[in-house]
Curated annotation (Swiss-Prot):
Alphabetic keyword roster: Cell membrane, Cytoplasmic vesicle, Disulfide bond, Glycoprotein, GPI-anchor, Immunoglobulin domain, Leucine-rich repeat, Lipoprotein, Membrane, Repeat, Signal, Transmembrane, Transmembrane helix
Organism: Caenorhabditis elegans
Protein name: Leucine-rich repeats and immunoglobulin-like domains protein sma-10
LRR repeat placement: 51-74, 75-98, 99-122, 124-145, 146-169, 170-193, 195-217, 218-241, 242-265, 267-289, 290-313, 314-337, 339-361, 362-388, 390-413, 415-437, 440-465
Tissue: Expressed in the hypodermis.
Residues of this chain annotated as glycosylated in UniProt: N247, N273, N387, N446, N495, N560, N566, N677
Residues in the Extracellular compartment per record: 21-840
Disruption phenotype annotation: Small body size phenotype.
InterPro entries with a match to the protein in the record: Ig-like_dom, Ig-like_dom_sf, Ig-like_fold, Ig_I-set, Ig_sub, Ig_sub2, Leu-rich_rpt, Leu-rich_rpt_typical-subtyp
Disulfide topology: C526-C594, C637-C688, C733-C783
Length: 881
C-alpha cells in the first residue's frame, strides 16, 4: 500500500485530472487550507466533492449510517478524520486502504457493534476514538491490533469480557480508556503485552476484585483509574512490578479489605485516592511501600482508628484527608512522623477529644481543617492546645464545633495563622486579646449569640486595625436585650458596659484534690454561678485524653440548684455539683475536671488529682531456709501497693551479724537479700517489712545453719572404686546426721534406692553395704543429706565391679610403686659412697631418711587400698541455695 501511494504521488502530474483528485472545495463544506469542515450538515454519506489534498476532514454531527470502500479513495494526505456523532453502523474494511497516512480517527458516538475491520491496516494511526458506541465484544486479535495505536478510547461501550490479547509485533500504546463498560474481571496479566502503557482507565465498570499481578509487567504505567467499580478486596501484590506508577484512584468502590503488601514495590506512587469506600482502619501492613506518596485521600470511609506507625511508611506525605470518617479521638503523636505534611483534613468526624500531644511534630503544616466535630473544649480550655505548636500554620477551619467561648490568646501556638474560619459556632464570649498575637488576613464567623458587655468592646477597633473584611464577620448581640440583634462593630463602645452580675457560667468554688484507699469512696464538689439553665459535666483524663463521665453503678452525679424565680431568662442560679466514685479502683487514679456551661459561655476548673492508695500486699514472702556453714542464704520478699511499698529487713538480733562482717548484700531493683558464707551466728528469724502511706505488713522466715560434713572425703581423681566380684561394697557417708531434722537419701544412677535385697543401711542410713556384688552393681552411687524439702550436700562415688584377674593386676601395680621408691633410695646411697668425701655421714642420713619415707609411702598405699575396698568418694558437691 505504501509503495502504491508513493507511485501515485510520483505520477501525479502525469495522470489525467479526475474527480477523485479534485482540489476544489465544492458544495456545502467549508474549506480553510487543508482543513475541510463538513460537520453539522445532516449529511447521509460522505460527499464526493471533497478535495483529495485534505489533511483534516471533519464530518461530525451528521446522519451518516455507513461508509463503503469507494469513499475517500486517493486521500493519501489525510491525517485526521472525524466522523463522530453520526449513526454509523458499518464501515467497509477496504475503506481504510484508502487512508495510508491517517493518524487520528474519531468515530465516537456512533452505533458500531464491533471494532471496525481493517482499521489495523492504518499503519500510521496514533489515536483511535471509539467512545460511546455499542461495542460489546472484543477479540484477542483486535486487542493485539490496538496495541500498535498510541491512544485508544473504548469508553462508554458495552464490553463485559476482556480477553487476553495475543502477542503483537508492534506495541506503541500509551493510553487505553476502557471506562464506563461492564467489565467484571480483569484477571491476571491481561495487560502484560501492553508494556508501553502509560495511562489505563477502568473507571465505571463492574470489577469486584483485584488479584495478584493484575497489572504486572506494565513497567511504564503512570496512571491507573479504577474509580466507581464494585471492588471489595485488593489482594496482596495487586499493584506489584509497577515502578513508574504515580497515580492510583480507587474512589467510590466498596473496598473494605486491603491486604498487607498491596502496594509493595510501588516506590514511585505519589497520589492515592481511596475515598468513598468502607475502609475501617489505617494499618501498617497495607501502607507498606508508599515511600514516595505525597497525596492520600481517605475521606468518606469508616475509619475509626489508625496505627501511628502506619505513617512511617509515607514520610513524604504532603496532603492527607480523613474527612467524614468515624474517628472519635486522636492519640499522642498521631501524625508526628509526617514532617512534610502541609494540609490535614479531619472534618466531619466524631472527634470530641485530643490528646495534649496529638498534633505535636507537625512543623510544616500550612492548612488544618477540624470542622464539624465537637472540639470546642480544645479552644475553650487553653490547656489542651498548650503543648501544640504549629509555627507555619496559615489556615485553620474550625466551623461547626459548638464553640461558645474564645479565651485570651486562644491561638497563640499558631503565630503564622492568616485565615481563621469559625462559622456555624454559637460564639457568645470573645475575651480581650483572644486573637493575639495573630496578624489575621481573613476571619470568618457568623454568631448571633454574642454577650455584648465591656469584654467585647475591643473587637471593632481590632477589626479596623487589621483591615479585615467586615462582610465575612457576622457578630450580633443577644444580650443585654436592648442591644439584641445589633452588630457588635456598629455599637458605640460607651454602651458596652459590664456588671458584677454577669450571666456567664462561672465556677465559684473549685474542686480540690482527693485521697482515698482502694475500695473506698471519693467525692468531688464544684459550685457554679450564672444565667440559667446551667449544665455541669465532669471529665476524667485517660491516657492524656478527656472523657466525659456518665452515671453508672459506681459513678454518681448530682446537681443541687437554687430556685428559679418566675422562670425568666434573666434569672441566675447557683448550682452545686457533686461527683461520687464508689468502690474506687486503681484505674480511677487520674485527673478530674469540672466543666460548666450556659448559652453565654463555659468555664473550666483546674485539673485536680484523685490519689488512690493501696496498702502493701505481698507478692512473694520469704521462706524458711536450712543451710550448711559457708553456703549463701537468699531470701525473697516483694510487695505491691500504691505508692510503691518500701521494703526493710529486721533480724531477731540487733545488729545483723552478717552486716558487721560485711557479708550482707542488697542490690538495686532486686527483691532478694543475700547473706554470704553463713555462720551459726546468722541463724534466727528474718522479718520483711513492707510499708507505705496506706499501711504496712510483714512476713518472717527462719535461717537454720547446720555444721555437717562428710567424715571420709576423697580427692576427686575420677578413678572408680574397684570391687572384686562377689565381694561386699561399703560406702560410708557419715556426717553427724541429726536424725530428728535430717535424713539421708541414697541413689544409684540418679534413681532412689528403695527395694534392693542385698542393700543394707546402718548408722541412720549413713552407711550403705551391698553384698555379693555383680557386674551390674557398677555405676554411680550418691548420698544426699536432706532437711525437709531442701538438700544440703551430696557425695558421689563411682563403683566398678571387676573379676579377680583385674583386681590382682591393680594390687601388683601398687607393689611395683613401693619397689621403685626403695630402689631409688639404694641407688642414691651408692652414689654418695663413691664420692669418698667428708660429708658421707650427712649423705647417709639423707639416704636413710629417704628409705624411711619410702616405707611410710608403702604403708600409706596399703592403707589406701584397704580403704578403697570399703569406701571411695568421687566428688562432694555443695548445694547452692
Amino acid at each position: 500500500m505504501i509503495v502504491y501511494s508513493l507511485l501515485l504521488l510520483i505520477l501525479y502530474d502525469f495522470l489525467p485530472k479526475v474527480v477523485t483528485f479534485d482540489t476544489v472545495c465544492i458544495g456545502l463544506c467549508h474549506c480553510v487550507g487543508n482543513v475541510v469542515d463538513c460537520s453539522s450538515l445532516d449529511l447521509s454519506e460522505i460527499p464526493t466533492t471533497i478535495p483529495n489534498n485534505t489533511r483534516i476532514l471533519l464530518l461530525s454531527d451528521n446522519e451518516i449510517e455507513s461508509i463503503d470502500k469507494s469513499r475517500l479513495k486517493g486521500f493519501y494526505f489525510l491525517q485526521t478524520l472525524d466522523i463522530s456523532n453520526n449513526i454509523i453502523r458499518h464501515i467497509d474494511f477496504e475503506f481504510f486502504y484508502n487512508l495510508p497516512n491517517l493518524k487520528i480517527l474519531n468515530i465516537r458516538k456512533n452505533r458500531l457493534a464491533r471494532i471496525p475491520r481493517g482499521s489495523h491496516e492504518l499503519g500510521h494511526l496514533e489515536k483511535l476514538d471509539l467512545r460511546s458506541n455499542l461495542i460489546s465484544t472484543v477479540t484477542s486479535e483486535e486487542l493485539s491490533y490496538l496495541a500498535a495505536v498510541r491512544s485508544v478510547d473504548l469508553s462508554r461501550n458495552l464490553i463485559s469480557y476482556l480477553p487476553k490479547p495475543t502477542t503483537s509485533a508492534k506495541v506503541n500504546i500509551e493510553k487505553l480508556d476502557l471506562a464506563s463498560n461492564s467489565i467484571t474481571d480483569i484477571g491476571t496479566d491481561h495487560f502484560s503485552s501492553f508494556n508501553t502503557l502509560v495511562t489505563l482507565k477502568l473507571a465505571r465498570n463492574h470489577i469486584t476484585t483485584l488479584n495478584q499481578f493484575s497489572f504486572s509487567r506494565l513497567r511504564k504505567l503512570e496512571s491507573l483509574d479504577l474509580t466507581r467499580n464494585m471492588i471489595r478486596e485488593v489482594r496482596f501484590l495487586a499493584f506489584n512490578q509497577l515502578p513508574s506508577l504515580q497515580n492510583v484512584s480507587l474512589a467510590r468502590n466498596d473496598v473494605y479489605r486491603l491486604d498487607d503488601g498491596m502496594f509493595y514495590a510501588c516506590e514511585g506512587l505519589k497520589h492515592l485516592n481511596l475515598s468513598t469506600n468502607r475502609v475501617q482502619a489505617v494499618t501498617e501492613g497495607w501502607m507498606f511501600g508508599l515511600t514516595s506518596l505525597e497525596v492520600l485521600d481517605l475521606s468518606y470511609n469508616q475509619i475509626q482508628s489508625f496505627h501511628i506507625s502506619s505513617w512511617s511508611h509515607t514520610p513524604k506525605l504532603k496532603w492527607l484527608s480523613l474527612h467524614s470518617n468515624r474517628i472519635q479521638s486522636l492519640p499522642s503523636g498521631s501524625f508526628r512522623v509526617l514532617r512534610q505534611l502541609e494540609e490535614l483534613i479531619l472534618s466531619a468526624n466524631s472527634i470530641d477529644s485530643l490528646h495534649k500531644f496529638a498534633l505535636v511534630g507537625m512543623s510544616s503544616l500550612h492548612k488544618l481543617d477540624l470542622s464539624s466535630n465537637t472540639l470546642a473544649v480544645c479552644v475553650e480550655d487553653g490547656a489542651v492546645l498548650y503543648n501544640t505548636s504549629m509555627p507555619f500554620l496559615r489556615s485553620l477551619r474550625f466551623t461547626n464545633n459548638q464553640l461558645r467561648v474564645i479565651p485570651k490568646r486562644a491561638f497563640e501556638r499558631f503565630p503564622a495563622l492568616e485565615e481563621l474560619d469559625l462559622t456555624d459556632n454559637p460564639i457568645a464570649t470573645i475575651h480581650p486579646e483572644a486573637f493575639e498575637p495573630l496578624e489575621l488576613k481573613r476571619l470568618v464567623m457568623n454568631s448571633s449569640s454574642i454577650l455584648c458587655d465591656c469584654q467585647i468592646s475591643w473587637l471593632a477597633s481590632w477589626i479596623y486595625r487589621l483591615k479585615l473584611d467586615k462582610s465575612s464577620i457576622i457578630a450580633k448581640c443577644s444580650y443585654p436585650p436592648p442591644l439584641a440583634d445589633l452588630y457588635v462593630v456598629a455599637i458605640d463602645t460607651a454602651n458596652l458596659t459590664c456588671h458584677n452580675d454577669s450571666p456567664r457560667a462561672k465556677i465559684v468554688r473549685q474542686p480540690v484534690e482527693v485521697s482515698t484507699l482502694i475500695g473506698e469512696k471519693a467525692r468531688f464538689t464544684c459550685n457554679v454561678y450564672g444565667a440559667s439553665p446551667l449544665s455541669i459535666e465532669w471529665r476524667v483524663m485517660e491516657n492524656g485524653q478527656p472523657r466525659v463521665l456518665v452515671q453508672d453503678s459506681a459513678t454518681f452525679l448530682s446537681i443541687n440548684r437554687t430556685a428559679v424565680v418566675n422562670g425568666t431568662f434573666d434569672e441566675r442560679e447557683l448550682a452545686a455539683a457533686e461527683l461520687l466514685l464508689d468502690n474506687v479502683a486503681m484505674t480511677d487514679n487520674s485527673e478530674y475536671q469540672c466543666v460548666a456551661r450556659n448559652r453565654f459561655g463555659s468555664d473550666f476548673s483546674t485539673h485536680v488529682k484523685l490519689q488512690v492508695y493501696q496498702a502493701p500486699k505481698f507478692t512473694y514472702t520469704p521462706e524458711d531456709m536450712p543451710l550448711l556453714v559457708g553456703q549463701t542464704a537468699k531470701f525473697l520478699c516483694a510487695a505491691t501497693g500504691t505508692p510503691r511499698p518500701e521494703i526493710k529487713w529486721a533480724f531477731e538480733q540487733i545488729p545483723f551479724p552478717a552486716a558487721e562482717a560485711r557479708r550482707l548484700y542488697v542490690t538495686p531493683n532486686d527483691d532478694h537479700i543475700y547473706i554470704m558464707n553463713v555462720t551459726k551466728e546468722d541463724q534466727g528469724a528474718y522479718t520483711c517489712h513492707a510499708t507505705n502511706v496506706a499501711g504496712q505488713t510483714q512476713a518472717s522466715a527462719n535461717l537454720i545453719v547446720f555444721e555437717n560434713f562428710f567424715h571420709y572425703p576423697e580427692s576427686p581423681d575420677l578413678s572408680p572404686m574397684l570391687i572384686k566380684k562377689r565381694d561386699a561394697l561399703k560406702i560410708d557417708c557419715s556426717c553427724d546426721l541429726i536424725s530428728s531434722r535430717q535424713r539421708m537419701v541414697w541413689k544409684r544412677q540418679q534413681q532412689v534406692i528403695l527395694f534392693l535385697k542385698k542393700a543394707k543401711f546402718s548408722d541412720n542410713d549413713q552407711i550403705l553395704t551391698l553384698t555379693q556384688t555383680t557386674f551390674s552393681d557398677s555405676g554411680e552411687y550418691s548420698c544426699e543429706l536432706w532437711v525437709d524439702d531442701t538438700i544440703l550436700m551430696r557425695k558421689i562415688t563411682m563403683v566398678k565391679v571387676v573379676n579377680e584377674d583385674e583386681f590382682v593386676s591393680s594390687e601388683a601395680t601398687l607393689t611395683q610403686r613401693v619397689q621403685r621408691i626403695r630402689a631409688m633410695a639404694s641407688k642414691l646411697v651408692d652414689n654418695i659412697k663413691s664420692t669418698g668425701n667428708g660429708i658421707y655421714l650427712m649423705a647417709s642420713c639423707s639416704a636413710f631418711g629417704l628409705m624411711i619415707l619410702g616405707v611410710i609411702t608403702s604403708i600409706c598405699i596399703c592403707i589406701a587400698k584397704c580403704s578403697c575396698n570399703q569406701n571411695h568418694v568421687f566428688n562432694v558437691l555443695p548445694v547452692q541455695v
